[in-house]
């Protein structure tokens, strides 16, 4: 059967448009569903279905569309978005391939990657060693430009897509204002943060690192036991106050893309008072070199951040509090958080090398989503992955 691809919502960039063009150039049928004016702005390839109704009616709309058009594959970005969940359910019922970004069936906690270290020890020696890939330029200003263009176009939604409701918990214009304020805060505190890091490292103060994640991230909202980062910090600081060495400290580093809507210094003061932790045992950073912190940290506590992978690269003891693809015996601490401060162990280096190579080999491509150069790299690498009948992970089974 000739492959027929349906693209749903992608990132706020030309990536899906370029990918659609590439798929079409191979002779495959390509179409897309646009849910808002931003989607329409970034799609110029070919057929586009415009869904203008409320999301409550979307499941039936997908059912009719899938039966009529006989699609073999759907491609989407973000498997928890309300506009995607009914599509995934229908696709799986009809044995339609689901590509979430570049991974079959799901990402993060929905990934098909095994959690059994024995599987990686068996498969690992058969997988080639991967480097960090070819570098590319992708300035943050390009990502910001695409995001703003997407949401400015969205000002037409009330007329063009009256039923659309964003999946984001905070409106874009609110985030933009807060981010400008935070950019000023980062600039003002950069020297202070660097001096604090240097003092901790050169004084050999034992410290544990907590990399913050975004409250809006589906990794927190859908793949963790927490409603937000405050919940995670209350649990972690309470445990640290009770169970850690009294001469150790916590270094808490904010996410580089945090909008600044949360006042973390004030929040941390409140939590310290609540759990009985002295505030001098907390160092909060808005900026600073993460590799330097990872090189010297006694361990890392995260929900399920990609920084967890970096911690494993640096051989740091790691505790994951949420669902993470790297959370398995031999890589992360499997005991409870209270015992981690005293008994956390370094990851198995060989197991991590096999795990990393397998993840790259089966689920990753070299490229990006925002600059022209990085998009071209992504499309070139993605095309053969999308056109195979079996995923690379399935071929290893």
Regions found by a protein language model. Give the residues of each.
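Structural motif
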Residues: 4, 72-73, 207, 249, ...
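Active-site and donor-binding regions of nucleotide-sugar-utilizing enzymes
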Residues: 7, 12-18, 35-131
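A short, Lys/Arg-enriched amphipathic alpha-helix followed by its capping loop at the start of a domain
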Residues: 18-28, 239-243
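Donor nucleotide-activated moiety binding/catalytic core segment of transferases
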Residues: 53-68, 256, 261-307, 313
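A donor-sugar binding/catalytic signature common to diverse glycosyltransferases
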Residues: 73-85, 286-332
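Catalytic core of nucleotide-activated saccharide and alditol-phosphate transferases
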Residues: 99-189
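Leloir-type glycosyltransferase catalytic cores
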Residues: 122-164, 330-397
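Conserved catalytic-core segment of nucleotide-activated headgroup transferases in glycan assembly
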Residues: 165-268
